[in-house]
């Protein structure tokens, strides 16, 4: 597998006997091993179903969009592509922030299925580079199924005249879906430092997708900033605004829950 960085930028001191028995970060960390073991056959089956259905719908909808394309749509389509990428980046940050900061692996259904990978990722950041295409993209494919199905339904039921009027909007939605579907693949590439295709490196270097150096900022413990992982365009402005910190302060004031408490619990496991 292609190489990746070994772990977060800051690591706490360990006692000699503790350091000898386990690594603070990485695949040998006790919490990382326990979390990885929670990946079940049922979860794998769900991911396979979502990936197959998602990419079938993407192919179906793309074919219809290409058939409906007109030169006069170009300006609005280009605007929609940029807007779709921006919204996908924000939504990736919102989901990433929510899963990193709140909830627990012990929660019914969503804990092991969706929060678990976020906990594993912080104590073993390179685990994602060892995941295959299905495990990497299965959950994102699940999230984009509903808008893909809605788009496919429109193509099957609406008249050509109505579809032509809706075309710029549908291109925006499709771009949002594509960026959303591939967010975790882009995230995986941001942790991969050797063997990436030249076109991926080009897109990273020109900041079309999340660059590798840019994403390192998030992986400095306690993982409280730079949550947007699709393009990363919104990380700096949101950080300057204190957006995530303000949201955390509001939620903590209302609920009494401490941000990233479960994340730190898993990070501190030593056996």
Swiss-Prot record:
Q: In which pathway does it act?
A: Lipid metabolism; fatty acid metabolism
Spell out the residues of the site Essential for catalytic activity. 96, 121-122, 187, 191, 215, 218-219
Key word Signal present: no
- Biological processes per GO annotation: ether lipid biosynthetic process; fatty acid metabolic process
InterPro entries, A to Z = Lipid_desat, Plasmalogen_desaturase
Primary subcellular site in the record, as a coarse category? endoplasmic reticulum
Per the entry's comment, what about the domains? Histidine box-1 and -2 together with other histidine residues are essential for catalytic activity.
Class of this enzyme? oxidoreductase
One Pfam entry for this protein is: Lipid_desat
- Motif Histidine box-2, chain ranges: 214-218
Protein location: Endoplasmic reticulum membrane
Superkingdom per UniProt = Eukaryota
- Catalytic activity entry: a 1-(1,2-saturated alkyl)-2-acyl-sn-glycero-3-phosphoethanolamine + 2 Fe(II)-[cytochrome b5] + O2 + 2 H(+) = a 1-O-(1Z-alkenyl)-2-acyl-sn-glycero-3-phosphoethanolamine + 2 Fe(III)-[cytochrome b5] + 2 H2O; a 1-O-hexadecyl-2-acyl-sn-glycero-3-phosphoethanolamine + 2 Fe(II)-[cytochrome b5] + O2 + 2 H(+) = a 1-O-(1Z-hexadecenyl)-2-acyl-sn-glycero-3-phosphoethanolamine + 2 Fe(III)-[cytochrome b5] + 2 H2O; a 1-O-octadecyl-2-acyl-sn-glycero-3-phosphoethanolamine + 2 Fe(II)-[cytochrome b5] + O2 + 2 H(+) = a 1-O-(1Z-octadecenyl)-2-acyl-sn-glycero-3-phosphoethanolamine + 2 Fe(III)-[cytochrome b5] + 2 H2O; a 1-O-(9Z-octadecenyl)-2-acyl-sn-glycero-3-phosphoethanolamine + 2 Fe(II)-[cytochrome b5] + O2 + 2 H(+) = a 1-O-(1Z,9Z-octadecadienyl)-2-acyl-sn-glycero-3-phosphoethanolamine + 2 Fe(III)-[cytochrome b5] + 2 H2O
What is a single cellular component term in the Gene Ontology annotation? endoplasmic reticulum membrane
Its membrane topology, per UniProt?
Multi-pass membrane protein
Give TM segment ranges: 48-68, 75-95, 162-182
Summarizing the function annotation, the protein's role is: Plasmanylethanolamine desaturase involved in plasmalogen biogenesis in the endoplasmic reticulum membrane. Plasmalogens are glycerophospholipids with a hydrocarbon chain linked by a vinyl ether bond at the glycerol sn-1 position, and are involved in antioxidative and signaling mechanisms.
Concerning PANTHER family, the annotation shows: PLASMANYLETHANOLAMINE DESATURASE 1 (PTHR48177:SF1), TRANSMEMBRANE PROTEIN 189 (PTHR48177)
The entry's protein name is Plasmanylethanolamine desaturase 1
Starting at the broadest rank, the lineage of the source organism is: Eukaryota, Metazoa, Chordata, Craniata, Vertebrata
Histidine box-1, short sequence motif: residues? 187-191
Task: Name the encoding gene, please.
Answer: PEDS1
Instruction: List its EC numbers.
Output: 1.14.19.77
């Amino acid at each position: 597998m292609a190489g990746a960085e070994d772990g977060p930028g800051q690591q706490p001191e360990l006692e000699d006997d503790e350091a000898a028995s386990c690594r603070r970060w990485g695949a040998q960390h006790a919490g990382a091993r326990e979390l990885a073991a929670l990946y079940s056959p049922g979860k794998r089956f769900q991911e396979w179903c979502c990936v197959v259905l998602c990419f079938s719908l993407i192919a179906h909808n793309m074919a219809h969009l290409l058939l409906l394309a007109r030169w006069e749509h170009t300006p609005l389509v280009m605007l929609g592509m940029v807007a779709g990428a921006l919204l996908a980046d924000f939504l990736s940050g919102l989901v990433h922030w929510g899963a990193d900061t709140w909830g627990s692996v012990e929660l019914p259904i969503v804990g092991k299925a969706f929060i678990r990978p976020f906990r594993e990722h912080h104590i073993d950041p390179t685990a994602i580079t060892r995941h295959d295409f299905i495990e990497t993209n299965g959950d994102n494919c699940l999230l984009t199924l509903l808008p893909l199905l809605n788009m496919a339904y429109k193509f099957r039921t609406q008249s050509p005249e109505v579809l032509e009027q809706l075309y710029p909007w549908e291109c925006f939605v499709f771009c949002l879906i594509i960026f959303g579907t591939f967010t975790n693949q882009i995230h995986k590439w941001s942790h991969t430092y050797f063997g990436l295709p030249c076109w991926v490196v080009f897109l990273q270097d020109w900041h079309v997708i999340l660059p590798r150096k840019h994403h390192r900022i998030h992986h400095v413990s306690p993982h409280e900033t730079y949550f947007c992982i699709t393009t990363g365009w919104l990380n700096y402005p949101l950080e300057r605004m204190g957006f995530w910190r303000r949201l955390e302060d509001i939620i903590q004031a209302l609920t009494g829950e401490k941000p990233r408490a479960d994340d730190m619990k898993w990070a501190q496991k030593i056996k």
